[in-house]
Amino acid sequence: VVGSGVIQLNIVIGTIIASFLPVGAISHIYYADRLNQLPLAIFGIALGIVLLPSLSKAIKQSDQETTNNIQNRSIEFSLLISLPSAIGLFILAEPIIHILFERGAFVAEDTFYTAKVLSYFALGLPAYIIIKVLVSCFFAREDTKTPLYISIVSVITNVVLSLLLIGSMREMGIAVATAISAWVNALLLYLFLAIRNHMKFDDLLV
């Protein structure tokens, strides 16, 4: 349940909780998640795969300058990709859903709710991709336990917030909970790296 695994687990949990909501809630989450996962699948996974070998090499060579540079440039790239994607999905959620899905049994009301869910999911998109980078920073140091423990905290956060928010926000509350839990995950990953002096922002990133 590390990296993309915890994201998928949170979606599964959200879907289970949504089963107690009115008919259609699960579909709204499903279609919104499909679109939200697209930038993550294209850029996040590729970034993590490319980052790990080069970062591992720099760490084994005790090259702190190169290590910091790789980590900072990776975060820069993740933000450069994810922020425009998140803004685009947030602003254009409704027309995107309308064009792609509104036909047959998927009516205007479904478009409205799915778009709302997507816009809230999008708030967590930068965090999802940053998580890919930060988890790779742990893996490159052969530390798999810390990201695992942090992912457990993220899942618990998601469950608690989802249960608190579904009463007033329906499936949108589940999307908000998922986004917040992703940022909690990313923040904790960064804090543990910083505390251990494994992460230091340079002037370019700041």
Give the ranges of each region predicted by the language model.
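Membrane-embedded alpha-helical bundles of multi-pass transporters/translocases
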Residues: 1-206
